[in-house]
């Protein structure tokens, strides 16, 4: 299973980070969420991808 952490700016994809380990993906999700905490234009989400 692969995991993508996607950063959206103004509801458009800005960057993608791909991980094969769920813990690494969650850590990156948390790190980016803290980084963009005060910016309302940015959102971060975790998506599970097949394969």
Predicted features along the sequence, with ranges:
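A short beta-strand micro-motif
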Residues: 3-10
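A short, exposed loop/beta-hairpin motif centered on an aromatic-Gly-Thr core
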Residues: 11-24, 45
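Short, mixed-charge low-complexity intrinsically disordered segments
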Residues: 14, 30-51
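Short amphipathic alpha-helices within nucleic acid-binding modules
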Residues: 25-29
């Amino acid at each position: 299973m692969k995991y993508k952490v996607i950063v959206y700016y103004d509801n458009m994809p800005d960057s993608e980070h791909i991980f094969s380990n769920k813990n690494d993906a969650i850590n990156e999700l948390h790190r980016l969420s803290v980084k963009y905490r005060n910016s309302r234009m940015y959102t971060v989400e975790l998506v599970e991808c097949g394969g």
